Amino acid sequence: MPKKQLLLLSFLLFTSIEVRSQTGFKFSNETAYLSELVTHNSENPGQKTHFIGWLLNTSTLKMNEKHSLNLGLMLTHGGEPSADIVGDLQTFSNLEAGSLYGFYEMYYQYQTDGFWLKVGQQDLNTDFLVSENGLLFTHSSFGIDPVATIGMPAPTYPPTAAAITAGINLNEQVRLQLGIFDGQFASLNDNFLTVNWDISKDEGLLYIIEPEFKLLNNRLTQKIGFYQHSGLFVDRETSNVSKGQSAFYLVSDYQLLEKGEKTANLFFQFNTSTKAVSDLNYYYGLGLRLVNYVGGKPNEIGLALGHAKLNDDFISVRNEYNLTSETVVELNYKQEVKDWLSIQPYFQWIGMNEINNPQRNPIILALRAYIEF
């Protein structure tokens, strides 16, 4: 194991620490480890079973109630079965990152009642394009849609980017979030996740705005977002370089039923971007999340469907992906075992609408563990 990696791992072992100094500074430290044993039945050659995981340490130094410094360090392990073997478009496991180590989010935050501001290296998906009900699911697209991650260099797990973000509550029903991100996420140095705040004119900037509305007696949370990337993109029709790509998206979370500790919830996602410079035409996802419908300790059941349509009118897109569309169905069950441990078996079916040499649609089976220290 490289020396840098050993030092990082040693630091991550100091978990759940809280120190309050005489000057009023408060230091806290938390560590979480997510891992899964996953297998697939893809016809492509390669290993069928993989053990992958993500170890994340988050340290926070609060200088008072309003100001804080935040540092995330991470370590990932395992192969990349989606990218290297199965070949699905949307990445079936949101843990997949290969073997990496280094910096995750690192930022200063100012926060008061109804307003926050962050400056530093950030993950786009921490505050934007997030469905609260979609967070239960293990497939990447239910966390952040593939139009954002495939269509542009989005700074989201594992890499991040320099950014300024803010959120303000306009009233009890309306919140507005804004962000400006470096147009190119921080690059890897071998397997090391670096810090890079250099802004390049050609790489541009990513501007995002996301109003959020609480409707139907707060049972519906509706986000209506828009982003514009000012970098250079290849026009899929002319092969010329053009400037800019924009997208419009929706994220909806709806509480269908509440009875004591039991809730039934729905979510919906939609995204479409500038066709000429985007590999994907549109994406939509929808799902059901049931909370505490099995007796005993806290538990969740999830069923979701996601569909991505490619811009297969363009020869370059057809040649690159050999797909017209891809549909995924996920069924999972998450059960708390201890305060610090939850387990989650899941099943996925991936329908790959291939253009040439179609193969059997792959099935994914996995068991995931969530461990908090």
Per-range role (PLM):
Residues T60-G183, S278-L286, L290-V294, P298-I315:
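Outer membrane beta-barrel
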Residues L34-S42, T76-E80, T126, T149, ...:
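Sequence/structural signature of outer-membrane beta-barrel proteins
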